[in-house]
Every structure is written in structure tokens, then in C-alpha cells.
Amino acid sequence: MNACHGRDRKILGRVIAAVLVLGSLARGLDAAPPLPLAAGLAAAEAARAMTAPPGFSVKLLAAEPEVCQPIAMCFDDRGRLWVVECYAYPHKLPAAEARDRILIFEDTDGDHVLDSRKVFAEGLNLASGIAVGFGGVWVGAAPELLFFPDADADDVPDGPPRILLDGWGAEDTHETLNSFIWGPDGWLYGCHGVFTHSAVGKPGTPESDRVRINAGIWRYHPVRHEFEVFSEGTSNPWGVDFNDLGHAFQTACVIPHLYHVIPGGRYQRQAGQHFNPSTFDDIKTIARHRHWAGDRWNDADQAASDAIGGGHAHSGACIYLGGAWPEHHRGKLFMNNIHGARLNEDRLTPAGSGYVGDGEPDFLFANDSWSQFISLQVGPDGQMVLIDWYDQTQCHQQRDAVDRSNGRIFKVVYENAATVSVHLGGKSDGELVAL
């Protein structure tokens, strides 16, 4: 999530004239909509302030005090939303002060409001990732990957969490294990940033036998309990997703923003060297465009960057594969642009043995400089859910720079579609295949 390395930027205004001039440039935009001049909006007001395409609306699912500091989320087989609250960020706390939590939300009456809320676990420290499956809940909280068993699915842990892996670094807490997602192969995938150095293994693993990672994507097999680095490189990724062919795509910050990721691939790095010193070269971005102007990001570039995507920092990666939105969005990758306070949309086109990525018009504008969508996922109803960290500061090097009093969950809905009720765990293999 760290996008500016120590600069506490507060975007309190925009150079509107420059935006209007530049709005016709890059990716065929007629004009950039009003940019985030608002700041510190109440939750319902923030939802109303957003600009979505025709036919779409933004629903407020939940907000403070029901949820604060949302840093990760996932859906379970009943369509419920699990959210990690990280109060420790950006610095790990003494154990006695740890109070990060895992919440379970549900919309029980289909009105696009999360009216049911449970606390599944609390007392976590620097929690940053979550996935539900295989009889429990998988949680990243450096230096550990944890598993909370809940075999009877009663929303109460069957016992204390098991430490599956340890050795996850926290030198830069913006860049530890994050963005958990189940891959089409059944492995649990996650991201890891370049300025945090991890030596991962099962508890008690000798230092010489541990797996090193400092930038890239890792994966863990939930049955065989195997851990490996899937790909190396990029910068501080907070988003990975798979298309309908099972191909992986990753977003990044500071360096070019989009990568088609293959097993064993070594990709452009923001800093440092690849572990193999004999690496001749690394794989570059598939993007044929940028979301920011200038050769090196600085505040002066903001007006120009607003016209072409908003900035160099991205969080989240969501390839739309639902059936509720217009067909032209299907298969495209959405990501949050942190400085631009908007969702970028990229088109992925097969090219040779890989892909190229081209920019579509920006999909959604928060019009609020405090908005920071950390994760975006498609729910069981085919609509997109966003968790919003919501803070005036986008870089959190100092502990007291973080506003821990708020957080929001939104849903982007097409044509006011109804919600759906699911319970995949109660279906047979044949019924699941039919879906």
C-alpha cells in the first residue's frame, strides 16, 4: 500500500484548468470528470459523491463504527463477506495491545446493506490477508501464516490458530503478505512487496532450508502444505487475479502497473536484484499505456496524471467474470488508483504466448481524496464489492498518521439488480459443475 515512500501527501485540491485541457488526451477520454476535491465525507455522502457509468450505482454496504481499518476481504461458500480490520498498521504492536479482528458480514434481506455482523476472531497483530476454505480460515499476520480451524462452520474457531508458516518479514509493513486468493488449481496465492525480506518455512525449519521472497507472488497448497514462490519481481503488489483461462495477472505500484504472470517468471523489479545472479533479463509489463505522467512521480505531475488514469500507485486486481454487468466489461481487469481515487479498467488481449494490456476509460471516480479502495472482488450476485481504507494520508510511515476511526464497504451495482442467496457447501459435485 505504500505508494510514495515517506511523503505524507494530502490531496486537498486539483488544478482543474489543467485537467480540462489534458482531459482529451490519452485513451480517448473526452474529458476527465471532476477530480477528488472533496475530503472527509460521511459514509453515505461518500457513496453519493461517486461517479459511475450510466446504469451503475454505488451502494453503501457498511461503514464505521461497524467496520474500521478494512485491509482485506473474501467471500465464503454462503456468500457472506469476511473482512480483516487492521488497527496495528503500519507498525506491529506489543502482543498485549494487539486488536486486529476478523468480521463476518451478511445481507440477510437482500437490500444491499450488510445488516448482520459477527466477530470471528480478535487479538491479531498486523493482519493483512484472508481466505476461507478447506475447513477454516487462512490469515496472514507477519511473521506468520495462520489457519483458524472451523470444521463445523459455526463461525467459532475450533481452537487456537495453527501456525502453518513463519518467517514472513515486516521491515516495511506496507509490503508483507497480502491479497489472498484461491487459484483455479486449488492453491492459495498471495502477494509480497520488494522492501520486505522473508525467509519462509514451517515452524522450526532451519534457516538454510527456508524459501526467500522479497517481491512477487507466492502460493501454498492447503492439503499437501507445500509452499513455493510462484513468480519473482515487480514492486509492492496488492492485487492478483485469474482470467477465465486460469492465467494470472498482477498489478503493481511505482513501476509499470500490469503483468501477465507465469510460474517461475522473473519480472521487472522496483529495486534490488533477482535471487539468481545469472538472470540475464526480466519480463516487462504487458501494459501499452501508463496511468501517470512524467518520468518520476511527484506532486507536480498530478494534474497531468489525472487525465490518463490518476497516478502510479495501484491496489487490488479484479478481472470481471460475473454475469450481471454489460458484456463489454467481462474479462477486463479493474484496479484502484490510489492517488487518482478511482477505478482504472484495463483490457487484456491475447498476443502470441501472452497478453497486452490497454487502457479503457476510467470506470469509477470516488471524487474524494480520502478514498482508498484496498481490495475489489466480485460477489456471488455478480456485482463488485470494494473495501475502502478511507484516510487523508496515503503513505503511513508514522504510526500517528493513520486515522483508525473509519472504514467503508461499497458495492457497485448494475441496474439495481437484486442480491442472490447462495450455499455452495450444500451442493453436490454435479450441481457445482452445472453452475
Where do the model's predicted regions map?
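Intrinsic-disorder-associated interaction segments
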Residues: 5, 15-18, 425
